[in-house]
């Protein structure tokens, strides 16, 4: 059976330095490797993320990023001090990176996927 492993998600940007600095300086992403103005490989919350400039006709990437931070208020205060508009929406605080990508922060992870085994167990328990 094939078992792929994701080693990076690449984000294309027209504002490489600004986006790089936002993720590193504001969201505390760890720089794994970097070639200035060409790419930066980051680790953000355990997720590998590569930022590259749009050089060969690539479109600016868009996505929603979900982060869980146990004590998120300090991060939200830092974002506000840096001029980032933060909106609260139930358990999430929402803000955007400099190119408009939506980032949602909660204090705990949402359950996005349950394994087939846990679903079978849940169904049997309900019966």
Give residue spans per PLM region.
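N-terminal beta-strand motif that seeds the catalytic metal site of vicinal oxygen chelate
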Residues: 1-20, 48, 63-65, 111, ...
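Conserved short beta-strand elements that form part of the metal-binding/catalytic scaffold
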Residues: 30-62, 102-109
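A structural signal for short, hydrophobic beta-strand segments that form beta-sheets
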Residues: 6, 31-32, 85
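Amphipathic alpha-helical segments
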Residues: 15-30, 78-79
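Vicinal oxygen chelate
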Residues: 2, 5-14, 43, 55-127, ...
């Amino acid at each position: 059976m094939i078992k792929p492993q994701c080693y990076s998600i690449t984000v294309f940007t027209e504002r490489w330095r600004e986006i790089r600095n936002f993720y590193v300086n504001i969201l505390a992403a760890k720089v794994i490797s970097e070639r200035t103005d060409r790419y930066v490989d980051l680790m953000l919350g355990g997720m590998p993320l590569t930022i590259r400039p749009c050089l060969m006709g690539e479109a600016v990437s868009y996505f929603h990023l979900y982060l869980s931070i146990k004590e998120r208020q300090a991060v939200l205060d830092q974002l506000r001090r840096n001029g980032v508009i933060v909106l609260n929406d139930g358990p999430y605080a929402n803000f955007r990176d400099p190119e408009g990508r939506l980032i949602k922060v909660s204090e705990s992870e949402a359950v996005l996927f349950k394994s087939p085994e846990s679903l079978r167990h849940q169904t049997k328990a309900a019966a």
